[in-house]
Amino acid sequence: MSPKPVNNRRDILLLMLYSPGRADTVNEPITGRTRFMKMLFLFREELMKRFLADAALTADDFYQFFPWNFGPFSRDVYDDLTFFELRGFIERSDAEEEALPEAAAEWERWLSMSRQEPGDSSMSEYDEQMFRLTDKGVKFVEDLYASLTVNQRRLLKEFKSRLVDVPLRALLRYVYENYESQTTRSQIREKVLGSHGTR
């Protein structure tokens, strides 16, 4: 049986969780929905072409981001996290770090756009979450990860190491400074960029 090729956006989401990061251990968690969103956006913009040079997956098949109240946003990221959580591949737990107002507001916006029932208490309050693969998820992804080239694994590890521990505000600032077209609708532009945020 030949290894499964990386051929859809969900593969990248799972590989991002599986890949070692700064601590050099498989399945290092990613803290925060907003961080995960911005990591996938930056993957698309900065890493995808090099990472998937010979793959069938193209930018058109990946998460489609649009300028939104808190920078680049794709509803599909949250939907895919929920999809894998409901199937027992991803688990989330409360993170130790405090949630930024920006992250809570982005979550509230997703809830209003999603198919969640109004008043669903399990989804109404925002707490910063830490995402990782379950044992079932690790088992599912390990063959896919093993099929990556040495260069792909290196690129993914460097990318995750760089972004997983950076303060969220610094990550947001990087996105806002480098991808201005994705911040045209932002409600927090001035807060993120300070006095440089107004032009």
Segments from the language model and where they lie:
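Domain-edge interaction signal
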Residues: 1-199
